[in-house]
């Protein structure tokens, strides 16, 4: 499946320490393998439907990754739970 990263995701991602960036990469990789049918649904991702096509996964204890699942996966935002809620209210 095709994917893209929005500017809102990139801006937040670049501000994360490298250790947290690595966890984000690992979570995205695990998600992509699941969506492509390479693995069963992973339990550690905390895959959660926000609304319609908007989904969230965990990247460690603090960070969440918000994405839209439609014809392609669009990664929208990375941040903590409260920041994701604020981002969704602004859309």
Predicted feature descriptions by range:
Residues 1-29:
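Arg/Lys-rich, positively charged N-terminal/basic patches that mediate binding to nucleic acids
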Residues 2, 11-15, 55, 59-91:
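Enriched for short, Lys/Arg-rich terminal
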Residues 7-8, 49-50, 69:
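Short glycine-enriched loop/turn motifs at secondary-structure junctions
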Residues 9, 38-43, 77-80:
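Preference for short coil/turn "hinge" residues that link or interrupt alpha-helices
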Residues 20-22, 26, 33, 64, ...:
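General N-terminal targeting signals
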Residues 30-58:
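A short, surface-exposed loop/turn module that caps and links secondary-structure elements
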